[in-house]
Amino acid sequence: MSTQNYHIVAVPPNEWGHMRPMIAFLARLVAVSLNSVDITVTLIIAESAVAKARTELSIQLAGEGIQSAESRFEVVPTAVHMFWPADAYLPALKATYAEVIKKKEPDFALLESMIHPFFDVVRSSATKPIKVGAWLPVALPSWTSMAPICYIRDDPQAYVKQVETTMAEKGLGYMEAASDAYLSHVNGRVLRIPGFPEMTDYEGFPQEPPVLLPVAMVVDWVFGIRDADILVTSTAQALERQGLQVFSKWLKEQPKHSDILAVGPLTSQRTPEVARKEKEEADAGGFTAFLDAWAAKKGPKSVLYICFGSVLLPAEIEHLYAVMRVLLELQIPFIMVLSDAARAALPADLAAAVRDSGLVKLTPWAPQQYILAHAAVGWFLSHCGINGTLESLCLRVPMVCWPLFADQPVLSILVAQVYGCGYELGEVRKGFGLKYRASTGKTPGGTVEDVTREAREVFSKAFFNKAERAKVDANLEKMATELNAAWDAEGDARASALALLDFIRK
């Protein structure tokens, strides 16, 4: 075993969908390094997320058979509320980082790509060689092949100049000009992306405009891709193999000549200890009782799980209400993650129907992997974020896809159209989402009536058509088998982790 210690400093943002997979990856990286490299990790975490991060770290380490974190991990709080824009986080993050490197400078920094302005801080603070990796918890190759990201990716300086020109000519502020310039590249052209059906560029915006993701954040994110010494993404080879090959070739042609390492899936290792902790949470929240009861009443695969992540709900909330009404009509029991505020805003008649049906459990939070692993759960209605998508596929739960923004539209197409592991809801759209879709040959209507009709068709097929379910299950089995082998001894994700260790040691 190497006697030299290698120190990693890692900085995720406080969005849980970005932080959790980074913690999971670092736990696995340390686990695979135990017999070859001495690794210690300092995690710089927003103060508000420290307790949650420590709990997740203990779960992930338990899953890897590592009982004590103290000798390998240190969690350091920083007085940051949001990791964007730069002037909101840089002063506090600089101060925290300065204290960290007083103890020991890192050999490698793993930084969320969107905090690209912090890359220079890390490099300029170093008194010895340091390598900077960009962390990208998205379906990176597929999303960056969509317009307008592909144009910004290929020439970000030209986009910055376009924004400046737009500001001068239209008298707009920076944020407005950035969105204006961004959307000017979306005009209905046909995209031909390896591994996908033909698509129109509108298909990347099922709920927009107005844009849901600050465009200036996307620009920082793209600069991070181009400026990093190596890229680490939580997507999986089984999901984006063709895209990763094409993206890797593109990346090698850029000035940094960097590599990209795909380390997904990062679902929790379901050891007895992890399963016990998950069940304790589920029992306390009433999830186990709900699922067990419906498994007894309706049998396995009879419950729908609904979650749109921790940030947004669908842009047209009436669409969501329409789908809920259809589920009640079809007598499909469901667990739905819904904030207290969103629950309070439910129309009175729908709230009463939900309450009186006995079919529904509404909750502001849910133990997602536990629920997806339960025998009662048959389908997952999801926005198709990368984490939930991989969790669902690994656990052999088919998906009903309702993408909102970012990489979710391409993941929806991969799941439903390319791999046949679920269905898309095509009518739950607005803005550019109502334009013609080359991938389906359809133009969505987007009315509540259209949504209601489609929801009846899709959920009836999903829950009550055994022949269709058998087709989906066969596709799921193939995908799950490949995904679940990724961290085996010869798996591609494990190989990526080992490649990163080699990169750090060089």
From Swiss-Prot:
It catalyses: 11-O-acetylcyathatriol + UDP-alpha-D-xylose = erinacine Q + UDP + H(+); 11-O-acetylcyathatriol + UDP-alpha-D-glucose = erinacine Q2 + UDP + H(+). Pathway: Secondary metabolite biosynthesis. One of its GO terms (molecular function) is UDP-glucosyltransferase activity. Disulfide bonds: none annotated. InterPro entries: UDP_glucos_trans (IPR002213). SUPFAM superfamilies: UDP-Glycosyltransferase/glycogen phosphorylase (SSF53756). Induction: Expression is induced under erinacine P-producing conditions. Its EC number is 2.4.1.-. It is an enzyme of class 2 (transferase). Keywords: Glycosyltransferase, Transferase. Gene3D superfamilies: Glycogen Phosphorylase B (3.40.50.2000). The keyword Glycosyltransferase applies. Pfam families: UDPGT (PF00201). The keyword Transcription regulation does not apply. PANTHER family: GLYCOSYLTRANSFERASE, UDP-GLYCOSYLTRANSFERASE 92A1-LIKE. Belongs to the UDP-glycosyltransferase family. UDP-glycosyltransferase; part of the gene cluster that mediates the biosynthesis of erinacines, cyathane-xylosides that show unique biological activities, including leishmanicidal activity, stimulating activity for nerve growth-factor synthesis, and agonistic activity toward the kappa opioid receptor. This is UDP-glycosyltransferase eriJ. It comes from Hericium erinaceus (Lion's mane mushroom). The gene is eriJ.
